[in-house]
Amino acid sequence: MCTRNKKDITTEYLNSKKIDRELKQESTTLQPLKLLLLGSGECGKSTIFKQIISFQDEATKKEYTPPSDYVIKNIFLNILTATSTFVRVAPSYNIEFSEEENQKIQSILNVFSDLENLDQTVFTSVSDNIKYLWNSKQIQSIYNNTNRIFQLNDSTEYLMSNIDRYSKPFKPTQNDFLRVRVKTTGIVEADFKIEAVPFKLVDVGGQKNQRRKWIHCFQDITCVLFVTSINDYDTLLEEDNSTSRFTDSLELFREMVNSNWFTKSPFVLFFNKIDLFKEKIKRIPVSQHLKDFNGNDHSYEETSQFIKNKFHTTIKNSNKIVYHHFTCALDSRAIEVVFNSIQHSLLMNVAEIL
């Protein structure tokens, strides 16, 4: 049996304290470890950004967490947007509404056309009408249709199921904060320290019209966190209904992972929204949209590995460091485990330099 004597333990402790002191001294001169979040629109990047911030100290969380009234207004906006989307696409599904339902719809659309004045009182005035429509057979048939011809926030069902709570003054929960959709435009940055080492986390808008701004963020990247929604194998881009989200994400990854900007930067590839993916493959065959898949359409293991391999085969440099994780960005514990692994590797590299 191998034992460690008191001298070994003391030496290890002193070495650890020495590294801590050196890190603290060097933190004033160290360049931040720059983490860049990349991915197509609505892949879950911003949710991962929110999660990473939530793992930091209280001061960092306070600085980068938006105020409650901002979150509340966007919850209302998400719900109104989903409702108006259902109404807009109803004719495409040969769905008609009664005169009473049309009156309820009109009251909602009146609010949607005057978002400047959207507040708790205004939302409450139409919340019963929204709830009525959401629970109607017409809207549910549109929502559950496997051939969707429209884009919808993944959190729609969650938000709609909480309308009663949102109909009176409330304090947003962490789950509300993670699920509310606010489209990222431009560049969002957060600075924080972990074990006295400075980090900079950068999130950029994923829509095609936002990508021209990305190049301003490409210098001195320590690690790229690339997020793809594994659930989007059957979905078209919101901004381009002729291109599938899967193809767009795959081509974007191919471009980024082989870019000269990131020759020395490791990649962490998040196959996100596995919770939705597991449910979707029960209803919508992967082979129906990814024609070269010839495995079991209902097997999570086979379908997820096939998609993972599609991404990995785009990597031209066999020495390129690319880690991958299958994730649900809403699962705080799982994302924390992944981020702890990332930060541990990066901090070890810093310690080796000192």
Curated annotation (Swiss-Prot):
It comes from the Eukaryota. The lineage of its organism: Eukaryota, Amoebozoa, Evosea, Eumycetozoa, Dictyostelia. PANTHER family: GTP-BINDING PROTEIN ALPHA SUBUNIT (PTHR10218), GUANINE NUCLEOTIDE-BINDING PROTEIN ALPHA-12 SUBUNIT (PTHR10218:SF200). The keyword Transport does not apply. Mg(2+) binds at residues 46, 184. Guanine nucleotide-binding proteins (G proteins) are involved as modulators or transducers in various transmembrane signaling systems. The gene is gpaL. This is Guanine nucleotide-binding protein alpha-12 subunit. Residues 327-332 are annotated as: G5 motif. Gene3D superfamilies: GI Alpha 1, domain 2-like (1.10.400.10), P-loop containing nucleotide triphosphate hydrolases (3.40.50.300). GO terms for molecular function: G protein-coupled receptor binding; G-protein beta/gamma-subunit complex binding; GTP binding; GTPase activity; metal ion binding. SMART domains: G_alpha. GTP binds at residues 39-46, 178-184, 203-207, 272-275, 329. GO terms for biological process: adenylate cyclase-modulating G protein-coupled receptor signaling pathway. It comes from Dictyostelium discoideum. Residues 31-354 form the G-alpha domain.
